[in-house]
Amino acid sequence: MKGQRIRIKLQGFDYRVIDQSALEIVETAKRSGARVSGPIPLPTRVEKLSVNRSPHVDKKSMEQFETRTHKRLIDIIEPTAQTVDELKKLNLPSGVDITINV
């Protein structure tokens, strides 16, 4: 697979799980003989939500919630057939969303 590149994007709410998954992917790719670039941390998306504490008089009293979506990017440069097979067999945690582009 000369000249090809596999781009893996990881997303999740817990950065520790994402970093652990990224480390597993990098180790698997290096073991199979491919070059790896990353994991590259991408900007964290923060969504904030403000909700009234009381449905009646206290309009100024609001409670704030936020969700943080952490992202990592891994490029596998010149993957071999063994690399693709090993990545298919890899078992990753359920808190990680994985997008793969070839």
UniProtKB/Swiss-Prot annotation:
HAMAP family: Ribosomal_uS10. Belongs to the universal ribosomal protein uS10 family. This is Small ribosomal subunit protein uS10. Pfam families: Ribosomal_S10 (PF00338). It comes from the Bacteria. Part of the 30S ribosomal subunit. InterPro entries: Ribosomal_uS10 (IPR001848), Ribosomal_uS10_CS (IPR018268), Ribosomal_uS10_dom (IPR027486), Ribosomal_uS10_dom_sf (IPR036838). GO terms for cellular component: ribonucleoprotein complex; ribosome. GO terms for molecular function: structural constituent of ribosome; tRNA binding. Involved in the binding of tRNA to the ribosomes. Keywords: Ribonucleoprotein, Ribosomal protein.
